[in-house]
């Protein structure tokens, strides 16, 4: 395919147009008075959301060069979401600010490599200062505040804090759709382990790339499955029940994996295969935990059991299993309560006699997975559109809360970024590196400027007053008052703010140092088909 190529200022300006289109669409959602964006879906009702990464992923531009710029910013939002789970709109706003001001300097003759060096130094200093002013998060009330700020809903904050209280900060919390209009919290027995599906073709939801299995059987073994004949009799038995199957094995390879995938694609059989968690003796113990939880038997040579002789009676069962590319969650295993309790007591006794901290830590992880359960937030709403929007807000709140517990919190509403300006400004840099530092100084103001604008205030006035206020004092855009942000519950997780700044600076620097852009040449449109001749006009030809 032929390529179109642009160079220097022409290349950068084309990409920046794409950056601006995407950022201008996303940044209207920032802050307590941010607006929503309506996304057209190819099927079903439109999605109304204020989630930055969801909006960014939907944007495709007709111009290939502009689209590349938009996609780079979308990558900033996605990466920030992957690392911190929130802060995607802030990351987008920061990227646009650095790129926009940086382009002016590069066009005026500044060296982009020097600018990049200054940006990196300034961002590193800002991140260090954010960590230094962070406050730890503890207690149900603080957790509820973080979740409430992220979701813009005190009710959501209560659900998230209650869920984390019941299953622990590192516990498994899932979000489901409720059949009613009310949102409620359930805690059900379950287990999560860090192994995902062996093939992406096993997913049942192509949009979220997850496999949801309702009422599945579980084959649990420490053997490697390479020959499909070893499990064929068992597969035929399960197929008759019309229920899905989760295979947990040492590995599934050879002819076995493509055969399972082919049957899944054809719709013959709903099956998902994952590798067994852990290694060595710890793997055997974890498989036994899963077997006890689900009422199954581990198919292992230690017990003299072979795959080819396995019957459906040896399989575990669960109400639901969810598998993504990285993890598996088993909910409501069918194992007896007494058997689970005995297993829990066994692990507790092993913890007491463990001689190394490492062994004790791993045993405590197993205990948490076996006894902690899974908290399920069931989201209810009046319409499907509201339901989708509510789920996205709760997901953001959950991610932000975990980030806050991990690295602490700072004053929210962009205040913390203003508070670190003094440290960044004090950096002794020269020439183009100083220009890069100044770009970051300007960008650090941008989230506050946009939050104020969305709330109907003049951003420059707010920023000027912020710079002359004591650290932690900020502007509450929801009601127009000046408050101590942390006391008022307007807080951001350090991990979210830090990730947004680091990812924005990284991609913005790459755009500024771009000298050539290569894009596919648009394919010519196919000629329109000639209109069919009216049969009545053929009379003279007969």
Curated annotation (Swiss-Prot):
ATP binds at residues 29-32, 86-90, 413, 476-478, 492. Keywords: ATP-binding, Chaperone, Cytoplasm, Isomerase, Nucleotide-binding. It catalyses: ATP + H2O + a folded polypeptide = ADP + phosphate + an unfolded polypeptide. InterPro entries: Chaperonin_Cpn60_CS, Cpn60/GroEL, Cpn60/GroEL/TCP-1, GroEL-like_apical_dom_sf, GROEL-like_equatorial_sf, TCP-1-like_intermed_sf. GO terms for molecular function: ATP binding; ATP-dependent protein folding chaperone; isomerase activity; unfolded protein binding. NCBIfam families: GroEL, PRK00013.1, PRK12849.1, PRK12850.1, PRK12851.1. Together with its co-chaperonin GroES, plays an essential role in assisting protein folding. The GroEL-GroES system forms a nano-cage that allows encapsulation of the non-native substrate proteins and provides a physical environment optimized to promote and accelerate protein folding. This is Chaperonin GroEL. It comes from Streptococcus mutans serotype c (strain ATCC 700610 / UA159). The gene is groEL.
